[in-house]
Amino acid sequence: FSKNKEIWRPNLLPRSEDMNARYKNPDNDPRGVWKPADFSVKTYSAANDFPIKTPSGRIVTPPKSRCRVTSEDQFRELVSENRIWFGETGNNVPSVKKFLSEVKDGSVSMTIWLYQDVGHNQDAKKEVKDFNETEVFGTPKPEKLMQRIITLATNENDIILDSFLGSGTTAAVAHKMGRRYIGIEMGEHAVTHCVPRLRKVIEGDQGGISEAVGWKGGGGFRFYRLGEPV
């Protein structure tokens, strides 16, 4: 939910080591590591449909129904700037060099989130057992999932509201990430799960995302009973 969907933009996610590892420097370019990107696009333009002669002498044309990313003049400029790669033998289809030093500090979130990145329910249940081994909570969320959501949607010191706090995952992750938070829970797990979980967080709990965010403990929270459940 956003107050204004026209102006809200999600934050970028931190770049992972795997993402950066895709950048190499086979030609020892002084601008640093780079990766090749397709030099053709689907949005066809006759002005950008031109043959290219590779350094080896081979003539290559764009794939069917596609054209070059730039005009021929712009392509020549890229060649003069050593931004076009024809492979180590000079015989490959041209690609444009994308330098790591020129990309954004983060990455745009994909619409599909894999369990390797955001965890799964088994992770969440293990996290709950760390502070309550006797009372099972049926549907906990993994801390990595909430970390992804909070990273995309908020900034440090923002206020996060979870009106169905459950096992306290949102509050625990918000605390570790330097956000303020309000959690509402009518069930008894407010006492059996949320309170002990937050106490462990304050004590420096190293479960969940703690290592990833460098959590060492600290802070505090207030617990209120506002009335009998309706």
Where are these regions (language model features)?
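Charge-rich, low-complexity amphipathic helices
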Residues: 23, 97, 101, 196, ...
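Active-site lining segments that contact anionic ligands and/or coordinate catalytic metals
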Residues: 47-49, 110, 160, 167-170, ...
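S-adenosyl-L-methionine
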Residues: 199-229
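Class I S-adenosyl-L-methionine
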Residues: 2-159, 191
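Generic beta-strand/beta-sheet core signal
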Residues: 1-2, 116, 161-166, 184, ...
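Conserved S-adenosyl-L-methionine
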Residues: 139-211
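A glycine-rich phosphate-binding loop feature that marks nucleotide/adenosyl-phosphate handling sites
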Residues: 17, 92-101, 166, 215-226
